[in-house]
């Protein structure tokens, strides 16, 4: 098998038994693809689909004036180049965006001509604001900060049928309802009331009888009845009544009279229930009509209007109940046939007929007016306005759109064949929905499950941005229509008509402040990836935390392989915010799909298909772990499968699909937990969430027990440097890698050099440190896609969030009570959990009413010592070690001038202007922060003189740019001439400097020739001469390009910065803080086993084993059984085996002997580790160690001395017997337990203790960020009580329960002190402070300010209250 550069250096032993069917897809695809479809950049007009920007323009344009004489049409758009690149945007605090230019055409028609002849066409490109661009890693830079747009899981447009689960009415009756949800436009609801009438609501307003809507659509009473009911025909005769017999309709009824066949034989006697058997007899007997008594006819309802045959007079309207009087009238008027509605209580309810009776309207106009009154109460309706409103609600393309998804879901739910159709509704749609609702009420059909993932779809960045853009365009449209009428006369151009501001504002609002545009979680690479793969049910058009019930939050059968059942926050958002599963993707409609492998006749095929939740129920899907033989045939006769969202056993022949991987169920974070299958779900949830909070440590350390997903996360997160093209490392240092590209991957004439610049010590969103370290050495060969440099929390191309610690499960003097963690001093000494945090401190100089603030080293009333770290501009030096209270940027602000006395005025006049009053408002280091200044940035407003420091920074940056560009050119030039030499040496020359005709060009000749002279050589070979020309052109072009780049950079640096109004200068100081681990810091494993460090013990006091090796961490064994996360114990055992194997390999390397002998022994031992197995536990992956050279084997072995990395993936991990085999190989006791000795006394502990290696994380809940103390500080304005919280430098709340405690103790004076001088007795606390300064500790409590507030509030209610003086 092919190994990547990093894999060859350190192979992870994989215990997986199932061969991989499908590689893990690119993890950020959902973000990148969605936005790519939105921009459709680089596509020609013909290639662009009707979606994204193009779709938004097409849907709003053309904009036609009110008179119809002028129109503005959309032609095309293009995106310009962004002004600043991503890094510059982050530094300057601006948005990374590209200008959008739209080509529009203004068409003016001739008013006079009848057939709208075109009078004038004006076409122009109009600037429409900036569109933020996505970076390569799926983020946006908005105002200098990286943000992520989270995808939203919302209810799909379409039609849904539901009932209230019996909650509305006291009887517990199920009230059914139907709701048509469009993508945009008014909602239409149909619902039953407890009396079984059907009502309609538009946009959740007041309800109206549903037949009003049908009348408004143009249906009359007869039509409505004909549409929703079957009819039964009765024949009226003088001597009685007959009816057409449709035998089936009588099923289940009680016979009110004897039913006999033509021969007079009794079929059903009176009072008996008619059964299926009776119906069969009736059908056989050939009866067509039945004689019925009068009682049977009473209460039946007429289906049509009944008119007197002679006079044409209306005797009875349709939907009238038959009574004795009415029947007599009908018979006497000579009517012989009456059609009645066929209804029964079982499956044909009279709902529409009942609704017609309560319908106050009788024709279309009345119905339209009724709807108008409901939508616009208080406005007088006219015929036109009522018609216009109703048309606009559901039938106008501008106001209503089901969208492609909505139409597909709508048609599928109503059982139609085609998936496409109009975006607006028509009469058939509304009638079909009503019919389906009635069917469900009649017991034919089921209501929908709204939590089914076939009814919820994902809206990603691109779609949300498009909607927002459309909103902006619609706002513009109103203004344009008004201006268009003027355009005819005034000769305006498109530019004068279109105002880009509303569009830009809509986009800015969406990216800047939408609920789904979130500040990127950048703690570590995993948290970045997870944030981009998050799916939220909250946000605009979604749910709210308060209203979401249990069902929405719960795990659903359709989540399988689409949404992770484990990873979701604890707390109020549980189940509303989810994570995509590893293999999930969205289809063109926005529904989540998951891949399955096809099974044909019980045999696996290589074909994989993606299936959405809508289609999944019909398939029979086997687990990935189903038993198969060598040829891929299912072995078991009965296979455990999922079918119709249930798990059952089914014969193997019926299986259609099979999971592609056992980890397709879980998300990326959950798939990083080894032995996940042995952990309780609640703890696994905490484990996945806590991995995202791990702080990158100083030295990343790969997990010895992993899952094999680490490399995918590291590569896809974008924090590493990945080779775009293969080649040889030309040069490498800490800040750049230069690759000479393989000749087969280059284009002719190109230099074939790739230069990668590394990110060094940059602050992340969470103040952690982003730093890249190179892995490659000069001269090494790499392939495209190899990782060349590690990022934060990455070790050799694998995600490394924490450290492998030697742990023991045992109690130790109560120091690990309640999940506390006891840590050895060695851990601190070796800097295992030391992390670097970078804080950005900003000082802003503004223009105030009293004059400008000034950044200067000349600060009033500050000693020399405090200024020692500042330069002459008043800004701290880089490299200065700063402590709390140190000045970073000296700044003075003008103070309000006091009114001068005449004497002062005179003195000023004599001695000249005294330095006007300024106060010190310098930026100082906050309490609790001490570190080193690593960078300073100065931004100056345009038109203001730059200070010396700004000029110095600018010069050094320019020098660096010039140096980089020159270096780049030198590398390119060298590579070009080396390629040319290959092409020229040995060629026959036709001439050249110092060359005879037909001479052969030698290496020596070229070595003595100056480079510019090479291009004068003429050669016979056409290819070589063409290469010479191309190379010369390419070099000249490259030089030009680099010069242009330099000039561009210079221009950007020298022009002033675009700062907020009123801001003159901004100085940003970056301070790096080194945080060692200390008591109070939170740590965790990957199995939800979290705790706080209680004490850091000297190494000599820690328990040690028989070899004298002390453990690093002592954990409480009681944390395991009740929490049921046994995965951590298995990890500990396998970790011990891994480290033991590493030790053995190290011993083999250390022994001095012949190299060949050492390599042979290592080869066989590594083969035993990687490819050995017992019984039938054969791992799917075997390592091809024979393909490794001796050198490579030695490199591999030396990288394994710290422990052989193992992978135990989710649901396909190491079995107990395999762990025991590894322990045996490592020469460790199979029980994994060790005899330990007390470090203090040297006595052995009573029982053996489980000791091994566990991967521990340090979480971003550091005690340094939480420690806080205050003596005096700021107070709240109204109550005069101290503020709360560390950020406000607040006090500790002394609440009512604390007051009760002091009352219970009878500590009256302490209580008085708490409620007065320590809180809000303004005079008392001032006196107290003064007394303490004087060394006098008496207190004189007065009236608390909050009591005065209470008095004032009572007075504001009009109640007089005053204090009596004793």
Swiss-Prot record:
Gene encoding this polypeptide?
A: rpoB
Q: Which family does it belong to?
A: Belongs to the RNA polymerase beta chain family.
Q: Which residues cross the membrane?
A: none
Q: Which reaction does it catalyse?
A: RNA(n) + a ribonucleoside 5'-triphosphate = RNA(n+1) + diphosphate
- The EC number on file is 2.7.7.6
Tell me the GO molecular function terms.
DNA binding; DNA-directed RNA polymerase activity; ribonucleoside binding
Look up and give the organism this protein is from: Marinomonas sp. (strain MWYL1)
Q: Which Pfam families match?
A: RNA_pol_Rpb2_1, RNA_pol_Rpb2_2, RNA_pol_Rpb2_3, RNA_pol_Rpb2_45, RNA_pol_Rpb2_6, RNA_pol_Rpb2_7
Q: What is this protein called?
A: DNA-directed RNA polymerase subunit beta
